[in-house]
């Protein structure tokens, strides 16, 4: 089975997008359900920043400057703190995670981070497996040559992609806890 739409296999951004978009279906076949907790947290922080900015604008339009200086100072401080929190969350907590999944029926979570380096057709994948309630954490870094999962016409071969991830997942399962 291949993807419905061909891509330019010489374009790293297109390769990255196509491979990242296929991750949910691959992990669904591995019995994982997508978790949106990181995305939800990032959205809450972002919406909070927008609310603070909107409230500041509203106060500026409705009241005289003398009446709202203290409130504006508080809102600017809140905006700064929320922006700093957003930056910290993006930089250190989320750090390039493109997929988070929870295995059905267990407390196991998997975090998938992907990237391309130096515009080479090597898809760098980092898998982090955690079990809630236990302090077990397993990590695996792997490289996928994209010509193994795309044909010459630019179609993603989903079965080959799934097989590669299945092999990596098996390696991760056999690793000892770190």
Curated annotation (Swiss-Prot):
Main localization category: endoplasmic reticulum
Misc remark: Present with 4890 molecules/cell in log phase SD medium.
S-S bridge residues: none
Assigned protein family: Belongs to the SPCS2 family.
Signal peptide as annotated in the record: none
Transmembrane segments: 38-58, 68-88
Annotated membrane topology: Multi-pass membrane protein
Physiological role: Component of the signal peptidase complex (SPC) which catalyzes the cleavage of N-terminal signal sequences from nascent proteins as they are translocated into the lumen of the endoplasmic reticulum. Enhances the enzymatic activity of SPC and facilitates the interactions between different components of the translocation site.
Keyword field contains tRNA processing: no
Lumenal side: 59-67
Name of protein: Signal peptidase complex subunit 2
InterPro entries named in the record: Spc2/SPCS2 (IPR009582)
Subcellular location as annotated: Endoplasmic reticulum membrane
Gene Ontology cellular-component terms listed: endoplasmic reticulum; endoplasmic reticulum membrane; signal peptidase complex
Species this chain originates from: Saccharomyces cerevisiae (strain ATCC 204508 / S288c)
UniProt-listed Pfam families: SPC25
Subunit architecture: Component of the signal peptidase complex (SPC) composed of a catalytic subunit SEC11 and three accessory subunits SPC1, SPC2 and SPC3. The complex induces a local thinning of the ER membrane which is used to measure the length of the signal peptide (SP) h-region of protein substrates. This ensures the selectivity of the complex towards h-regions shorter than 18-20 amino acids. SPC associates with the translocon complex. Interacts with SBH1 and SEB2/SBH2.
Positions in the Cytoplasmic compartment: 1-37, 89-178
Keywords: Endoplasmic reticulum, Membrane, Transmembrane, Transmembrane helix
GO biological process, one term: negative regulation of post-translational protein targeting to membrane, translocation
């Amino acid at each position: 089975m291949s993807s419905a739409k061909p891509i330019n296999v010489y374009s790293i951004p297109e390769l990255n997008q196509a491979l990242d978009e296929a991750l949910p279906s691959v992990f669904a076949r591995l019995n994982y359900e997508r978790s949106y907790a990181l995305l939800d947290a990032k959205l809450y922080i972002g919406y909070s920043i927008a609310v603070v900015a909107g409230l500041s604008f509203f106060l500026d339009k409705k009241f005289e400057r003398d009446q709202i200086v203290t409130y504006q100072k508080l809102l600017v401080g809140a905006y700064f703190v929320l922006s700093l929190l957003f930056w910290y969350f993006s930089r250190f907590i989320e750090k390039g995670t493109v997929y988070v999944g929870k295995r059905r029926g267990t407390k196991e979570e998997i975090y998938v981070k992907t990237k391309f380096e130096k515009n080479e057709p090597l898809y760098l994948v980092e898998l982090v497996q955690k079990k809630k309630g236990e302090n077990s954490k397993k990590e695996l870094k792997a490289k996928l040559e994209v010509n193994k999962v795309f044909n010459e016409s630019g179609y993603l071969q989903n079965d080959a992609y799934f097989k590669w991830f299945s092999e990596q997942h098996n390696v991760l399962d056999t690793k000892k806890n770190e």
